[in-house]
Structures are given as structure tokens and as C-alpha cells.
């Protein structure tokens, strides 16, 4: 009988083999073709595909020399959360403590909270060691960063000043207290200080990647900066956003304006005005233009709201409700978010004890959860038909994979950040288009793209 380490290694080998088979299918290489081109035996290729032998670095290096593929294509994501949930205790967080100086003085104490190789979070517990005596945005004791690539949701504990550059590149300061929250976009310079000399302020700085991480970022970096930058359209207003989308889709179809006019019966002057952001198109115009470009109308629609790059949400302005509707075990408090990231949701959840054995949640997003209360809570969940339980102490943090059935029992308070990563949205729509029948092959390829024995197609 295999131990857990051997079982995990076996699963990783199988996934690696399925990934390798997917690459061969995409390149239209049969196993025997790959064996001949890589200079190895068909038996070894078959063992790799079947998950019985490791795909060696030597074979990968040969492959990238003869095929139009990248080294990263051959590596699968290591799953460090095999039961669907990962926990980091408050004590483990404390052991990761490091002091970071700015201008030669202690400025922040950083501590890790739970992270997973399969999740987009990079969350930190940060204590503000710099204390200020005023709320001036120009305070020279506040040492600014240069902004960073990741999106950031922040939950505030204690008296903290939050400094940031607004859209007009003016320094601003928000006076934050426990329960307040904010969202900040990538590359916006910012910093934090404490206002209370008796007790340093604290933040949960939950940074995370969205759609531009991983392969997308690599694809952009494979282009020149000049070429890659042109994918960034002007979304500064609704009119400019709409105009940029209309022009982009027309140009990638190599359609002259007069041809679009013929197809849509929209006057050329009107199309020119729309592409110059003179006005927003009507719903009927969007439908006609979408048909002429052979796209869905959603591709041509500007966002309903042009959100600010920094969203500050005082606790007393947050909406509240109870969930589930009947039992009302949880009080939800809606924290800072932005419509620009529709699959990012932040909440404070007040848990009220229940004897119910029901799993109250099944969420199709990655979840970071931090126990900000004073009481321990019980987390119950189910994964692959097995039931699990963990005690969540104050200061503990947990990661929960998407679609895990779970609940919390006890009386306490949690901060929860849910994010989509790279799957919800366009990737989800594409997977839905492929359909449930083919989902398994889309995730992990299980067969060659054709049957060499010419068997009849099984459509059942």
C-alpha cells in the first residue's frame, strides 16, 4: 500500500503524462513520431504518457529544440492542497516574521499567511511600525513604495493611515480603523503608518493575481514592449472604452469602415463618430456591429462603470445580510471591491453557532480566510467523498479550493477574500462551450486525437 507521499508522486506522474500526451496531440505527433524525433524508445514514451516514468529534463530540452514549444509547457502545477483545504497556524505565521526597514528605520513587520501553489493569493500580515502624529498626506515619515504588479485587498485592524496616489497623481491619505477595507490596483504607489503610539496598527494585505499572471504575462513578455503595450486600450471613460473596442475588433477583421456600413446599414459618419468616442453606441448599433464582426455583442460593450484605481470602504458604509436565508447562521458584511474584478469578493463573516450538519457553502472561487476574532471555529468540509474537520484558532489562516462543500461552526469572526484566478470569465465560457462531455479531456488529456486502429466513433 502506497503512503501519502508515494500516492501524491503517482498522481503527479499521471498528470504529467496526460499533459505530455496533450502536447503531442496539439503537435499532431503520435507516440512513435515523438520517440523517433526525440531519439528515445517508444516504450519510454508510452511509460511517460501512462504516468509510469518521469519526463526527464533531458527529454524536455530536446523537445524545445525541435518543436515550437516552451519549457514551461511540460511542467504541471504542483498541488500542495490534496484534501482541498490548507491551513497555516498563527504560530507558523509568527515564525515567518521579518522586519523591513525604510530610510534606515524599522517600517513594517511582515508575516506570511497561508499560500498555496494552486491559488493566486500572496497574502501577508503586516504591522505598521512607523507612527505618525498627523494625517498629512505629505508627512515625510511615510515612506512610499513604487506600487506592485498584484491587485491588493486590505483589511484594517487598529488605527492606520493609508496613503496613495490618486488618478491625478496627487498624494491622498485615508484615516482607517478596524473593519475598514480598501482595494488598490496594480502599480499604484502607496504606504501605511500607525496613528496610535500605544498600539501599532495592523493590516491584512491580501495581494493576488488575476488574468495577467502566468501564461498571459509570459505571452506579453514574448512580444516587444511596444507591441505588447498596444493591447492596453483606453478605458479612461465609457466613450473611449467603447471606441477602443469597436476599432480593435474592426481592425483585427481588416474591415474598412465602408464595408462595415454596408453590412450594418449604419452611416459611415456614425461609425467614425463611435470610433472617435463622440458618443456611446445604442444597443441596436452594438448588435449590428457585433454581427458584422462575427462576435458576441458583449465583446463590444464598455464597462458599466469606470471605477477608480483605489476603492476605500469605511466599515459603517458596508452592506450586511444573513446567510443562508432560513437558518441565518452567518452575518455577511460586504467589504471593498471593484466591478472591474467581478470574480473578486471580500467579506467579513460573523459566525453564529449551529447544530446543523449541512455544508452551507460551495463556492466556485479560490478562498482565503483569516480568523480575526477572539474565538476558535470549527471548519468542516468534504473532498472526494471524504469528510474532514479542522480547528481554526484566532490568527490562523486557511485556503479553500473552489467548489469544496464546507461550513463553519462556533461563534467567531472571519475575513474572507474570494478570487477567480484565471478560470472564471472567458476561460470559463470557453470550457462551457467545449461542454461537460469533453471537460475531462480538456483538463487532463486521456486519449490520442485519433484511433490508429480505425475503431468506430463512440458517440454515446
Language-model features and meaning:
Residues 113, 165-188, 194, 335, ...:
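Short acidic-glycine-tyrosine-enriched beta hairpin
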Residues 127-132, 144-166, 206, 349-353, ...:
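Short, conserved beta-strand element in jelly-roll/cupin
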Amino acid at each position: 500500500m502506497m503512503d501519502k507521499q508515494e500516492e501524491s508522486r503517482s498522481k503527479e506522474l499521471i498528470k504529467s503524462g496526460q499533459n505530455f500526451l496533450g502536447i503531442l496531440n496539439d503537435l499532431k505527433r503520435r507516440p512513435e513520431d515523438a520517440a523517433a524525433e526525440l531519439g528515445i524508445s517508444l516504450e519510454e514514451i508510452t511509460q511517460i504518457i501512462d504516468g509510469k516514468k518521469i519526463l526527464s529534463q533531458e527529454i524536455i530540452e530536446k523537445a524545445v529544440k525541435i518543436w515550437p514549444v516552451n519549457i514551461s509547457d511540460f511542467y504541471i502545477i504542483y498541488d500542495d492542497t490534496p484534501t482541498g483545504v490548507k491551513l497555516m497556524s498563527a504560530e507558523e505565521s509568527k515564525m515567518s516574521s521579518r522586519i523591513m526597514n525604510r530610510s534606515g528605520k524599522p517600517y513594517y513587520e511582515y508575516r506570511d499567511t497561508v499560500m498555496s501553489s494552486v491559488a493566486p493569493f500572496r497574502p501577508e500580515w503586516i504591522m505598521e511600525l512607523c507612527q505618525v502624529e498627523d494625517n498629512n498626506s505629505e508627512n515625510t515619515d511615510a515612506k512610499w513604495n513604487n506600487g506592485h504588479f498584484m491587485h491588493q485587498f486590505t483589511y484594517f485592524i487598529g488605527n492606520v493611515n493609508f496613503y496613495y496616489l490618486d488618478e491625478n497623481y496627487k498624494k491622498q491619505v485615508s484615516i482607517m480603523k478596524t473593519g475598514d477595507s480598501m482595494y488598490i490596483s496594480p502599480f499604484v504607489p502607496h504606504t501605511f503608518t500607525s496613528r496610535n503610539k500605544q498600539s501599532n496598527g495592523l493590516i491584512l494585505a491580501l495581494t493576488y493575481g488575476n488574468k495577467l499572471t502566468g501564461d498571459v504575462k509570459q505571452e506579453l513578455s514574448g512580444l516587444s514592449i511596444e507591441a505588447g503595450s498596444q493591447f492596453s486600450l483606453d478605458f479612461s471613460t465609457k466613450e473611449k472604452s467603447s471606441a477602443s473596442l469597436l476599432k480593435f475588433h474592426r481592425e483585427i477583421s481588416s474591415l474598412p469602415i465602408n464595408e462595415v456600413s454596408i453590412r450594418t446599414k449604419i452611416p459611415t459618419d456614425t461609425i467614425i463618430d463611435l470610433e472617435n468616442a463622440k458618443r456611446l453606441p445604442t444597443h441596436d448599433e452594438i448588435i449590428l456591429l457585433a454581427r458584422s464582426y462575427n462576435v458576441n455583442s458583449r465583446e463590444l460593450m464598455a464597462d458599466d462603470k469606470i471605477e477608480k484605481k483605489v476603492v476605500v470602504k469605511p466599515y459603517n458604509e458596508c452592506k450586511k445580510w444573513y446567510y443562508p436565508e432560513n437558518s441565518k447562521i452567518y452575518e455577511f458584511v460586504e467589504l471593498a471591491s471593484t466591478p472591474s474584478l467581478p470574480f473578486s469578493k471580500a467579506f467579513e463573516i460573523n459566525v453564529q453557532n449551529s447544530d446543523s450538519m449541512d455544508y452551507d457553502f460551495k463556492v466556485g472561487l479560490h478562498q482565503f480566510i483569516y480568523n480575526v476574532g477572539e474565538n476558535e471555529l470549527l471548519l468542516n468540509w468534504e473532498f472526494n467523498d471524504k469528510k474532514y474537520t479542522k480547528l481554526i484558532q484566532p490568527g490562523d489562516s486557511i485556503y479553500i479550493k473552489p467548489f469544496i462543500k464546507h461550513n463553519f461552526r462556533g461563534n467567531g469572526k472571519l475575513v474572507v477574500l474570494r478570487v477567480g484566478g484565471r478560470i472564471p470569465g472567458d476561460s470559463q465560457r470557453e470550457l462551457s462551450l467545449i461542454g461537460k462531455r469533453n471537460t475531462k479531456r480538456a483538463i487532463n488529456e486521456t486519449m490520442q486525437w485519433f484511433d490508429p486502429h480505425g475503431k468506430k466513433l463512440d458517440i454515446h
